Curated annotation (Swiss-Prot):
Binds directly to 16S ribosomal RNA. GO terms for molecular function: small ribosomal subunit rRNA binding; structural constituent of ribosome. Belongs to the bacterial ribosomal protein bS20 family. InterPro entries: Ribosomal_bS20, Ribosomal_bS20_sf. The gene is rpsT. Keywords: Ribonucleoprotein, Ribosomal protein, RNA-binding, rRNA-binding. GO terms for cellular component: cytosol; small ribosomal subunit. GO terms for biological process: translation. This is Small ribosomal subunit protein bS20. PANTHER family: 30S RIBOSOMAL PROTEIN S20 (PTHR33398), SMALL RIBOSOMAL SUBUNIT PROTEIN BS20C (PTHR33398:SF1). It comes from Clostridium botulinum (strain 657 / Type Ba4). Gene3D superfamilies: Ribosomal protein S20.
Amino acid sequence: MANIKSAKKRIKVIETKTLRNKMLKSSLKTTIKNFLTVVEGKNVEEAKAAYKTAARALDMSVSKGIIHKNKAARTKSRLAAKLNALNA
């Protein structure tokens, strides 16, 4: 356990940031799963809207430092491929 006041504060700050990051990562996963279920339903218009939401969530996660930009790009590419396969 930390004895210095600033170290104690850092522990508190890290705990709150960890919780926030977990929440954002969880909502990101939920958004991606929603897109995948819509794609399985084969509804093109809903899939486009769900892709837009998922891409926005991925970009936000990158800007907040939740995930790496390459992971977001890779995920968006895979989701776009599924959307394009649905259109074809």
